[in-house]
Structures are given as structure tokens and as C-alpha cells.
């Protein structure tokens, strides 16, 4: 599977190497060195429009959130077919008005992750040729020929081979005419820089999330907490993996340059975003209201947990009151559990009612579709069996009958409103 990912990476690196070595006249080692930066420029330039679209879609989704909340509040408690259809229509109109594209945020990751995997796999195969570095048998890797693989293997930066890594066995380092100390002295600042840049990028991403976080969504709140944890752990990965894992020098260079590009691109795009699409007053008011509600719930939860823990501590300090304190904790837990279950049950009932209404709408739509298909077949059969003396329909009528305007939304998207012909 990873072999497929090698081809685009090796193809881009080969083109940059040919351009820098054959056209610009750079030394072979320098050409391979700068081809890594060329790979970053190429990939980031390709995904830059999608990244901007992701930023823009995120800001648009924030602007539309107060209007969606108002619609949900307006149709709260309405489960009949007419209300659901009207709500769906108004939501679709709102999405069209603001140009919402929920898939825009997926593209950068879908492009960048395979590139990183392909680069890592390609460099690892270069650093570990068949037969070992002592008796290498060079083979084609993606679009790279055996001669180009051998040339890359001989590439050096500050006298450190591009395929070398800190945890590489001593025999292989000796074959590459280097030592672990030389490799460590070169890559350690790179991995530290990569860790710092990663931390800054995560902090900026968290800042954007705090700006527009949907506090009414449990998933959004969970993702925000996950990002907080990852912002602490993410900077550790470059150091730990770089110093203990098989991460060649070339990947360290790619890592630093890619994170630096990400930082500069994020700063530029955030400045443009704030100037062209500033947060609206409606969103700010709605965001503050939702945040206050969320914080009140969190405070209530903390008070509950703190009271229960305090009672447990008092049970140890004052054992003569243990039974009373335990009964208090049991009662507190029962009350809170009952409140949570009641709220869950209410949400579940609402969801079930809407789901049942939606099923009825889907069944009715499918029935109408079958009926229309049967009518069209009957009309076509009547035309074929018609007598030659009978008036035949015009050419336009035949075309219309042979290509009936069946509602496409009924099969693919049965949730939408049926056409006026029904």
C-alpha cells in the first residue's frame, strides 16, 4: 500500500533534482538537499487553496451558527412532516446562502498525510537498500532509478548523509563515513526546532478553535479538550521519534521546513481572514451565551464532584459520621444521575419522533417514485401498442416520455421536499 505513496513523492523530488542539478548546475548533494525543500513548496502550494477554503468555511460555519440555533429553537417540539420539511428547506437555503462546504476541511489532511508517509517510506527504503549498506543492491524506488537512489544515498549536508539517523547501527554509520555523534549534533537542533514550531502551530490552532468553538456541541468540546492534550504531547514526538526511531536526516529537514511553512502560512491566512471575514456581532453574542451556559454546567459538575470527594475525606477523618456522609453521597449521586438520564431520555424521545417522521417521509417518497415509474412505463407501452391510425405524439412528447423527469432527490436524498408535480 505504501509503495503507491512513493510514486508522487519520488516524482516531485526527481523533477526538482533534475531542475537544480542539470539546469541550475548545483552539486549533486546540494540538489538533493534543496529538492526536499522543493517537495515542501510543491505540496504546500497544491494544498494552500484547500487550506484557505478550510479557514473560510470554518469562519462561515461560525457566522451561520446563531441562525441555525434560532431555527432549532423555532421548530423545537415540532415533529410533524410539514414542520420537518420546512425546517430542512430553511436549513438548506441557509447553507446555500452562506456557501457552506463541510468537506473543505478534509482535503489538506488527505493530501499531506499520504505525502509524509510516502516520504518516510521512500527515505527508509533508500537508507536500507537490499543487501544492506555494506553490499547494497540498488533498485528503483518509485520514479527514481537505481543510479539516482545511489546518488541520493551519497548526498550530504554539513558532512552528514541524508539517509543517516541517530539510532542507525554503527556498521551502517561507518559505511556512510559518519558517526553517531556527528549525526546527533546535526539533527538534534533540527528536531528541537521542529518541536518548537509544532508547539507554536498547535497553539495557533487552539486559538482559532477557542475563537469559534461550538460550546453547545459535545463533540466540539471534546475535540477542544483533545487539542489541549495534543498541544502538550505533540512537541515531544519530533524529539522522541527523531532520537530513538529510524528517522533519517532528510525527514528532519522536511519536518522543519514544513512546520516553518505552516507557521508562516497560518499567520498570513489568519490576518487575511480577520480582515475579510471578521466575526459578526450576532456570532459574538451567541458564542458568549453558549460559553456561559457551558461554564455553568461545568461549574455544577465540579461542585458535585468536590462535594462527594469532601464527604469521602470526612468519612475518614470523622468515622462516626461515615454512615450519614455515605448516605449523603448516595443521594447526591442518585439525584444527579436521575437528572442526566431524564435529559438524555428527553433528547432520545425527540430524536425518535423525528426519525420516525423521517422514515414515513422516505417511504412516501419511494412510493411516489414507484408510482411515477409505473405511469411512465404504462404510457410508453401504450405508445408502442397504439394503432398506426391513431395520432402519434410529437417528437418532443416522445423525448419527454422516454426520459421522464424522475425526482433525483427522492432516491439519493429522500429528505428533500418533493417536486410540485406530486
Swiss-Prot record:
Keywords: Cell membrane, Chaperone, Membrane, Protein transport, Transmembrane, Transmembrane helix, Transport. It is found in: Cell membrane. GO terms for molecular function: membrane insertase activity. Residues 401-413 have a biased composition (Polar residues). Residues 350-362 have a biased composition (Basic and acidic residues). Residues 350-422 are annotated as: Disordered. The chain crosses the membrane at residues 30-50, 103-123, 183-203, 226-246, 253-273. GO terms for biological process: protein insertion into membrane; protein transport. It comes from the Bacteria. The keyword Protein transport applies. It is a multi-pass membrane protein. Its main location: membrane. GO terms for cellular component: plasma membrane. Belongs to the OXA1/ALB3/YidC family. Type 1 subfamily. Interacts with the Sec translocase complex via SecD. Specifically interacts with transmembrane segments of nascent integral membrane proteins during membrane integration. Required for the insertion and/or proper folding and/or complex formation of integral membrane proteins into the membrane. Involved in integration of membrane proteins that insert both dependently and independently of the Sec translocase complex, as well as at least some lipoproteins. Aids folding of multispanning membrane proteins. This is Membrane protein insertase YidC. It comes from Corynebacterium glutamicum (strain ATCC 13032 / DSM 20300 / JCM 1318 / BCRC 11384 / CCUG 27702 / LMG 3730 / NBRC 12168 / NCIMB 10025 / NRRL B-2784 / 534).
Amino acid at each position: 500500500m505504501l509503495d503507491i505513496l512513493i510514486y508522487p513523492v519520488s516524482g516531485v523530488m526527481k523533477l526538482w533534482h533534475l531542475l537544480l542539478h542539470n539546469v541550475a548546475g548545483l552539486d549533486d548533494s546540494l540538489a538533493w538537499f534543496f529538492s526536499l525543500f522543493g517537495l515542501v513548496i510543491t505540496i504546500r502550494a497544491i494544498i494552500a487553496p484547500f487550506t484557505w477554503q478550510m479557514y473560510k468555511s470554518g469562519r462561515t460555519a461560525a457566522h451561520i451558527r446563531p441562525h441555525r440555533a434560532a431555527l432549532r429553537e423555532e421548530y423545537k417540539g415540532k415533529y410533524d412532516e410539514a414542520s420537518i420539511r420546512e425546517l430542512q428547506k430553511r436549513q438548506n437555503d441557509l447553507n446555500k446562502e452562506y456557501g457552506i462546504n463541510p468537506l473543505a476541511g478534509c482535503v489538506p489532511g488527505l493530501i499531506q498525510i499520504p505525502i509524509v508517509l510516502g516520504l518516510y517510506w521512500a527515505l527508509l527504503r533508500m537508507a536500507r537498500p537490499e543487501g544492506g549498506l555494506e553490499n547494497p543492491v540498488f533498485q528503483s524506488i518509485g520514479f527514481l532509478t537505481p543510479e539516482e537512489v545511489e546518488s541520493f544515498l551519497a548526498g550530504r549536508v554539513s558532512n552528514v548523509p541524508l539517509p543517516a539517523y541517530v539510532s542507525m547501527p554503527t556498521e551502517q554509520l561507518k559505511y556512510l563515513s559518519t558517526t553517531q555523534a556527528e549525526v546527533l549534533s546535526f539533527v538534534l537542533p533540527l528536531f528541537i526546532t521542529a518541536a518548537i514550531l509544532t508547539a507554536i502551530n498547535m497553539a495557533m490552532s487552539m486559538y482559532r478553535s477557542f475563537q469559534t468553538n461550538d460550546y453547545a456541541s459535545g463533540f466540539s468540546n471534546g475535540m477542544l479538550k483533545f487539542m489541549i492534550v495534543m498541544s502538550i504531547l505533540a512537541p515531544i514526538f519530533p524529539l522522541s521519534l527523531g532520537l530513538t526511531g529510524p528517522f533519517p536526516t532528510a525527514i528532519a529537514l522536511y519536518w522543519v521546513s514544513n512546520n516553518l511553512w505552516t507557521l508562516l502560512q497560518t499567520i498570513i491566512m489568519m490576518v487575511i481572514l480577520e480582515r475579510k471575514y471578521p466575526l459578526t456581532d450576532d456570532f459574538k453574542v451567541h458564542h458568549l451565551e453558549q460559553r456561559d451556559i457551558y461554564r455553568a454546567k461545568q461549574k455544577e459538575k465540579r461542585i458535585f464532584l468536590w462535594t462527594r470527594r469532601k464527604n469521602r475525606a470526612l468519612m475518614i477523618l470523622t468515622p462516626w459520621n461515615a454512615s450519614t456522609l455515605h448516605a449523603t453521597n448516595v443521594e447526591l449521586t442518585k439525584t444527579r444521575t436521575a437528572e442526566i438520564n431524564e435529559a438524555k431520555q428527553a433528547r432520545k424521545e425527540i430524536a425518535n419522533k423525528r426519525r420516525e417522521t423521517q422514515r414515513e417521509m422516505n417511504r412516501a417518497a419511494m412510493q411516489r417514485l414507484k408510482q411515477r415509474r409505473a405511469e411512465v412505463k404504462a404510457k410508453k407501452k401504450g405508445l408502442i401498442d397504439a394503432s398506426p391510425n391513431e395520432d402519434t405524439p410529437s417528437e418532443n412528447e416522445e423525448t419527454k416520455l422516454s426520459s421522464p423527469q424522475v425526482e433525483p432527490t427522492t432516491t439519493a436524498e429522500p429528505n428533500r421536499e418533493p417536486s410540485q408535480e406530486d
